[in-house]
Design a protein with these regions (language model features):
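A short mixed-secondary-structure module that forms the rim of ligand-binding clefts
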Residues: 84-129
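An N-terminal domain-cap segment
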Residues: 37-92
Length: 253
């Protein structure tokens, strides 16, 4: 059984949409594309920052697919994992992932507890010094960001074939994301793969509630948006490669 996933958009395409398209206009919210506004939201979202267009949210979730999986039963647990989104499966889509079988959060999966998946996008400090209107320049700094919360009940995946297909789909997704290598998961001896897979607990979450918060100056005066965009392009975080080198050199032994 394969997991019906859609091709992931490029990081450049998603960032261009977030930082230019959304900041410069309003995302279309026609009746067909909307998700119902949550009656009990998990995050505070001012109207100006609320995005409900499901296709837009799904594209974001596929691009920024390394999630925080949050559960509160039987105790608060947060696990950081890659995920796969099947956008056409279920009313709002279905999230697939896995955690270590030694992780205490397995108890929440086995119990069918409710979970929240947090998808984080670009974020950064915004200085009033970047802006041009008098109102903004006399104000205080802020932090712009994009995030999607998706909630639903955890369902364990125990069937060996479904477990294998989840791993294959997940690996294919990320191999394509780095441009591909000569590694072929599906070419490995399946019995050996499944022996190793006893160390994980796969799961799925059919999304029952989805919330998009995009705080990207879309409600600000046009001159401020135009002035801020090139400054955001110069905001560079340390890359994984750079931080890994730093960690190797400075971490306590």
């Amino acid at each position: 059984m394969s997991i019906p996933v859609s091709p992931s958009p490029s990081r450049r395409d998603v960032l261009a949409t977030l930082l230019a398209g959304l900041a410069g206009s309003t995302v279309s919210l026609d009746a067909e594309a909307q998700s119902a506004e949550p009656s009990d939201p998990s995050v505070y979202i001012p109207k100006a920052h609320l995005v409900q267009d499901r296709a837009f949210l799904h594209a974001f979730m596929r691009e920024f697919s390394f999630i925080e999986l949050v559960t509160t039963s039987p105790t608060l647990r947060i696990t950081h994992i890659p995920s796969v989104l099947a956008p056409a499966q279920g009313k709002y889509g279905t999230i697939f992932g896995h955690i270590s079988a030694q992780n205490d959060q397995v108890k929440a999966i086995r119990a069918g507890a409710r979970a929240l998946a947090v998808f984080r996008g670009p974020h950064g400090y915004v200085s009033p010094g970047w802006l041009v209107t008098d109102f903004s320049r006399q104000g205080v700094p802020t932090w712009n960001f994009a995030v999607v919360h998706a909630a639903g009940r955890l369902v364990p995946i125990d069937d060996p074939e479904r477990k294998y297909e989840l791993l294959a789909t997940l690996i294919d997704q990320y191999e394509q994301g780095i441009g591909g290598t000569d590694y072929r998961f599906r070419g490995l001896p399946k019995d050996e793969v499944m022996k190793r897979a006893t160390g994980i607990q796969p799961f799925e979450i059919e999304i029952e509630q989805i919330e998009g918060k995009f705080k990207l100056f879309q409600e600000r005066p046009e001159p401020d948006k135009v002035a801020a965009l090139p400054k955001l392009d110069t905001y560079r975080e340390r890359s994984l490669e750079a931080y890994t080198r730093h960690f190797y050199a400075t971490a306590p032994k």
